[in-house]
């Protein structure tokens, strides 16, 4: 049986580019959420349902669709799911009311599976000692897509309107859908592919949650981290574009652009986790995150000072994700996609909670309530990271 070939360096980075483009779609809404709310005549709490339902649909899509990656070609599945994303974007672009816009966003979320197929695909095609580094490259692509989406959406919406943002996104998705067949390997069936039928794959998730309980802890940690990430950027957009601060959506985009420089440090944190072990590294990263996020409230009314906690959060947030993924991507190859399914479902459930909480807290308590809630979630993440280290140590070894 033909073995999957090792990824070249160029392929690793092209996969990261693909991950960036397909991930970005869900995050264009963040800097323009105020503009969209005003266009449709709704308040902050109601518009918060758009990203919340997107995140819930993403969790459902991952639960139902991602396990197929353990049985069928990742290449074929990725292309099919990107076509589905194109459909959701077109609905959002043409929507004349909030209901149809929300339907398109929800459809988009359901098919946003490619960023989570790609790490499992890559993990079977890299040497074990490079797993942390390559996982970090793909994670950097995801985070870069999220951050650049905010920059582009904020600036484009300020000068050309929010619909133009989604027309551009549709064009990018069509381009990446056409490019994927040349990036991903064709015609090799993985020797470790599961022989379980589809319903068996879904049912096996319960057995994995029972037998591989650490993935639940890693998923909870990332769910908290991702939820606070979403709450921060939604609350920040409402705060900066509201009457108290009075900035345009382009300023939110520029701030996201500044934060995007942090993505270049992510591969370094992955290599560090390769050396000292992912669980120990995660404890350290979570402590740094608490220190950074504690500055949100005192610096909240000064745009320049706000850059400090935002930069710190954007440096260590992806690093925590990388270390959490490393705790299960080192497991048996035939289990990795399903373990990823459990992890990502928990992550996006956290994102849905963060979407609702970020907008509702801002409407009820302003920036103070939002900043304090995010700090509390950071503290809980830090505690769970320490618990995970105490329970599991770093049993899968540093490799260097």
What residue ranges belong to the model's regions?
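Juxtamembrane intracellular "pre-TM" segments in multi-pass secondary transporters
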Residues: 2-6, 185-219
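Helix-to-loop junctions at the C-terminal end of transmembrane segments
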Residues: 62-73, 264-278, 362
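Structural signature of the two symmetry-related core transmembrane helices
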Residues: 77-90, 280-295, 375
């Amino acid at each position: 049986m033909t073995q999957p070939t090792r990824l070249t360096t160029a392929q690793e980075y092209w996969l990261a580019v693909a991950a960036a483009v397909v991930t970005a779609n869900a995050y264009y809404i963040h800097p323009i959420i105020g503009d969209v709310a005003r266009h449709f005549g709704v308040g902050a709490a109601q518009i918060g349902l758009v990203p919340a339902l997107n995140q819930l649909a993403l969790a459902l899509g991952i639960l139902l669709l991602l396990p197929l990656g353990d049985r069928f070609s990742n290449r074929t599945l990725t292309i099919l799911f990107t076509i589905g994303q194109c459909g959701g974007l077109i609905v959002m672009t043409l929507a004349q009311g909030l209901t149809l816009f929300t339907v398109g966003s929800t459809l988009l979320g359901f098919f946003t599976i490619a960023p989570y197929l790609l790490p499992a695909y890559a993990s079977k095609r890299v040497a074990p000692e490079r797993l942390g580094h390559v996982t970090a490259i793909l994670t950097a692509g995801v985070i870069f897509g999220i951050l650049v989406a905010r920059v582009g959406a904020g600036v484009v919406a300020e000068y050309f309107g929010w619909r133009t943002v989604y027309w551009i996104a549709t064009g990018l998705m069509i381009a990446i859908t056409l490019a994927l067949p040349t990036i991903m390997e064709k015609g090799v069936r993985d020797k470790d592919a599961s022989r379980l039928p589809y319903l068996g794959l879904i049912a096996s998730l319960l057995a994995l949650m029972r037998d591989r309980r650490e993935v639940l802890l890693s998923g909870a940690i990332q769910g908290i981290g991702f939820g606070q990430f979403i709450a921060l950027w939604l609350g920040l957009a409402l705060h900066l574009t509201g009457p108290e601060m009075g900035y345009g959506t382009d300023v939110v985009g520029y701030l996201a652009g500044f934060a995007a420089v942090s993505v270049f440090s992510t591969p370094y944190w992955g290599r560090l986790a390769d050396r000292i072990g992912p669980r120990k590294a995660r404890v350290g990263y979570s402590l740094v995150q608490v220190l950074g996020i504690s500055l949100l409230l005192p610096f909240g009314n000064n745009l320049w000072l706000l850059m400090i906690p935002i930069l710190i959060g954007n440096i260590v947030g992806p690093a925590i994700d990388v270390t959490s993924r490393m705790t299960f991507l080192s497991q048996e190859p035939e289990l990795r996609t399903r373990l990823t399914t459990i992890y990502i479902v928990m992550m996006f459930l956290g994102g849905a909670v963060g979407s609702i909480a970020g907008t509702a807290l801002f409407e009820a308590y302003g920036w103070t309530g939002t900043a304090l809630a995010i700090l509390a979630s950071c503290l809980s993440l830090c505690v769970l990271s320490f618990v995970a280290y105490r329970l599991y140590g770093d049993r899968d070894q540093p490799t260097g």
